[in-house]
Amino acid sequence: MPKKKPTPIQLNPAPDGSAVNGTSSAETNLEALQKKLEELELDEQQRKRLEAFLTQKQKVGELKDDDFEKISELGAGNGGVVFKVSHKPSGLVMARKLIHLEIKPAIRNQIIRELQVLHECNSPYIVGFYGAFYSDGEISICMEHMDGGSLDQVLKKAGRIPEQILGKVSIAVIKGLTYLREKHKIMHRDVKPSNILVNSRGEIKLCDFGVSGQLIDSMANSFVGTRSYMSPERLQGTHYSVQSDIWSMGLSLVEMAVGRYPIPPPDAKELELLFGCQVEGDAAETPPRPRTPGRPLSSYGMDSRPPMAIFELLDYIVNEPPPKLPSGVFSLEFQDFVNKCLIKNPAERADLKQLMVHAFIKRSDAEEVDFAGWLCSTIGLNQPSTPTHAASI
């Protein structure tokens, strides 16, 4: 079907001509922004939503600590805490991430400067950015509030996420990664369920990508975790590229489909407990690892084996076969899609262009799925008065 010529995006400058977070000449900025947005292939609904977000954003002005009122905590991780806040001057509800860093003023200023690139990241698949500032030893990053939270939170409520839903997630992640790469020459560097956000309108967006090299370096010492989504080449310290993000997406999809972090892979007994039936396939053939004396049983999922120490886990990712989806419960297309994401050699791993034309993505794109309805019933959210079908995302 031929694509309709997109309607020009309508952005009206803020009436008082005020600067958007320190940027001046609003008129010129808006013209440039309008041009950039018209290059994106947006449908009518996406266009209207981006327009509405950017028009709201113009009312925000300079962000200051005193202008925020805390509503609730949304989550913690990645070196920071995220709060749902009200921005009193504009009345907007935002997500505010606070990152505490002991750093020199010059480094701090560089981080704030580097984060300004986020003002340029306008896509239906990327969380909207209001601005960043420093106050009282903390860097604040203010973003669009996504009322469905992150997919790791959704997974906890859902137990497992259905394949049809993960099809829509895959499309959004691929389009988000493609946008970052093609329009901004940046890779995400941290694709995982907690960095994929969703909302009651059925939107799926990436957040927390590596736009500030200085912030990545400053936070490098704060890595604490029991799971890793990093690719084998990245863990080995060799050169890595956007192919590394594709591995992370594949690993995240297996986790969300099966209902637990997939390393070490579940054995036949655990798969039977997870899916309520006997499951065929390689994922079920892994012999149980010997249990270290005195190590506690894992409370994660239904695995009776001890939790891996982080060095064991990283060694497993680098040296053992990659995770797979068990056969018999998922379509062959989905299994093949995941396998192509989880090839250990990055040169052989599928790239974004190949994944976009994969049979699983083509099928998922054509499917009518009420993503918003599924999300709202799963996590107990009220659906907006005009529900969104993810097919139109």
Curated annotation (Swiss-Prot):
GO biological process terms, semicolon-separated: Bergmann glial cell differentiation; cell motility; cellular senescence; central nervous system neuron differentiation; cerebellar cortex formation; endodermal cell differentiation; epithelial cell proliferation involved in lung morphogenesis; ERBB2-ERBB3 signaling pathway
Annotated active site residues, numbered on this chain, are 190
Q: What is its EC number?
A: 2.7.12.2
* Residues with PTM Phosphoserine: 218, 222, 298
Q: Which reaction does it catalyse?
A: L-seryl-[protein] + ATP = O-phospho-L-seryl-[protein] + ADP + H(+); L-threonyl-[protein] + ATP = O-phospho-L-threonyl-[protein] + ADP + H(+); L-tyrosyl-[protein] + ATP = O-phospho-L-tyrosyl-[protein] + ADP + H(+)
Residue ranges for the region (Disordered) are 1-27
The UniProt record gives the binding positions of ATP as 74-82, 97
What's the name of the protein? Dual specificity mitogen-activated protein kinase kinase 1
